[in-house]
């Protein structure tokens, strides 16, 4: 997709660095158009660790490419975090069958609440409250 649309590619989390690098090289994407970022430990962190950097580059629209079973939660979190900085997201699902694992509503709404709290306070409530296995 990045090559078809001649867009820069930002990989944040998901697959390990070696696998991401292999795919990028296999697909023939120019290295100067690709940024790998592994600071985040979860979906909220994928957005909060990058949103201000993306905005400072003048980006106002992002294609969010992720597995179809993760897209709804990613969009819920991303629309709050990126939206707070004036960045629009368009979700692009990647098929995951037969390995799809549906993410529950508790996880989705929990991460959405974390995103809203981060926008208001600049902090992740998980850091203050301790880890809750239901949100992972």
Question: Model-found features: residue ranges?
Answer:
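A structural signal for short, hydrophobic/glycine-enriched beta-strand patches
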Residues: 1-106
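A transmembrane-helix-recognition feature enriched in membrane-embedded lipid enzymes
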Residues: 101-131
């Amino acid at each position: 997709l990045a090559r078809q649309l001649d867009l820069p590619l930002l990989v944040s989390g998901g697959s390990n660095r070696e696998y991401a690098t292999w795919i990028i090289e296999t697909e023939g994407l120019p290295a100067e158009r690709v940024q790998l970022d592994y600071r985040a430990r979860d979906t909220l962190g994928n957005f909060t660790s990058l949103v201000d950097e993306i905005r400072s580059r003048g980006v106002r629209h992002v294609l969010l490419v992720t597995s179809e079973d993760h897209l709804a939660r990613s969009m819920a979190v991303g629309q709050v975090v990126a939206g707070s900085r004036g960045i629009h997201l368009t979700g692009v699902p990647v098929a995951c069958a037969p390995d799809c694992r549906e993410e529950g509503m508790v996880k989705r709404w929990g991460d959405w609440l974390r995103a809203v709290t981060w926008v208001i306070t600049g902090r992740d409530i998980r850091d203050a409250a301790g880890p809750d296995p239901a949100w992972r």
